């Protein structure tokens, strides 16, 4: 990728988040929340509820209303296309910016079977497909709270309102290795990922790939040198900009402002907390999109 001279300035600073993050995982969701989770997964066509969603779900009155307002756009051809555009752009950015070596032969040398390599690729496909959707949703929540604007609702192309493909994969939930179950080398890899990416926890993507610990160690080792480069930071800026642009073109108007959050039942303090939490998650997702792309390009060679 030919970067402009000022590409080093195209960075997304990490938001300050002093709030305690309290995700509500699927196995702890009550009936009402489980129904929302199922609808979200079916709408996105994915088998997992992202930690970003689980964290916002802690603020239940807000989350339920935000999803109700966003879901009509998420069920459309436009949303599918906008998410796919981000995924494809991520593929272009990583492929043009970095020399990514294939890992397939190395995995075979390590004893991985054809079946296991296929399973790794299938898991990467799930997150590669779903992460852009979570990014756009998180961007809508964040920008709505911060700006108070109404996004979208003026689609000129009737095709944008067409329903998305009914094909989806909502089961089974990918097997994930939680941090408290990680020992030895995997625990060290988790710690390195969190420190390098400035994460307060390990994302679902890495926990799913940790099902194959030696694979994750190898894949992360190949990605890590890219993280602090101007090309990577400019790529995050680009992905974030595309998510922002998608908001203005949402087929159905979305608005969930700070005042709306208060009217939904949150207190001022809870709303301040929520803004910090969603700002951090939205920031993380632009990098996560690129990282999974890098992993996938490694695995396909």
Curated annotation (Swiss-Prot):
It is an enzyme of class 3 (hydrolase). Keywords: Hydrolase. Pfam families: DehI. Its EC number is 3.8.1.9. It catalyses: an (R)-2-haloacid + H2O = a (2S)-2-hydroxycarboxylate + a halide anion + H(+). InterPro entries: 2-haloacid_dehalogenase_DehI, AhpD-like. One of its GO terms (molecular function) is (R)-2-haloacid dehalogenase activity. Catalyzes the hydrolytic dehalogenation of small (R)-2-haloalkanoic acids to yield the corresponding (S)-2-hydroxyalkanoic acids. Homotetramer. Belongs to the HAD-like hydrolase superfamily. S-2-haloalkanoic acid dehalogenase family. This is (R)-2-haloacid dehalogenase.
């Amino acid at each position: 990728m030919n970067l402009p001279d000022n590409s080093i300035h195209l960075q997304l600073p990490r938001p300050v988040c002093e709030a305690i993050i309290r995700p509500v995982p699927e196995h702890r969701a009550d009936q009402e929340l489980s129904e929302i989770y199922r609808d979200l997964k079916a709408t996105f066509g994915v088998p997992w509820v992202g930690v970003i969603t689980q964290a916002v779900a802690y603020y239940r009155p807000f989350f339920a209303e935000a999803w109700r307002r966003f879901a009509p756009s998420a069920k459309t051809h436009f949303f599918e296309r906008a998410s796919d555009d981000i995924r494809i752009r991520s593929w272009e950015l990583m492929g043009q910016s970095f020399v990514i070596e294939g890992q397939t032969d190395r995995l075979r040398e390590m004893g991985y079977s054809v079946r296991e390599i296929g399973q790794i690729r299938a898991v990467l496909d799930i997150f590669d497909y779903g992460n852009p959707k979570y990014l756009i949703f998180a961007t809508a929540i964040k920008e709505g709270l911060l700006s108070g604007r109404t996004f979208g609702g003026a689609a000129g192309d009737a095709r944008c309102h067409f329903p998305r493909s009914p094909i989806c994969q909502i089961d089974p939930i990918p097997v994930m290795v939680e941090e408290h179950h990680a020992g030895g080398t995997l625990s060290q890899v988790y710690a390195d990922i969190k420190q390098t990416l400035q994460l307060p926890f390990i994302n679902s993507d890495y926990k799913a790939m940790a099902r194959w610990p030696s694979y994750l160690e190898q894949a992360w080792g190949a990605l890590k040198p890219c993280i602090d480069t101007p090309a990577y930071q400019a790529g995050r800026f680009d992905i974030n900009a595309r998510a922002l642009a998608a908001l203005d073109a949402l087929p159905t108007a979305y608005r969930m402002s700070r005042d709306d959050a208060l009217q939904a039942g949150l207190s001022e303090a809870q709303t301040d907390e929520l803004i910090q939490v969603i700002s951090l998650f939205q920031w993380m997702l632009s990098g996560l999109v690129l990282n999974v792309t890098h992993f996938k390009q490694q695995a396909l060679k």
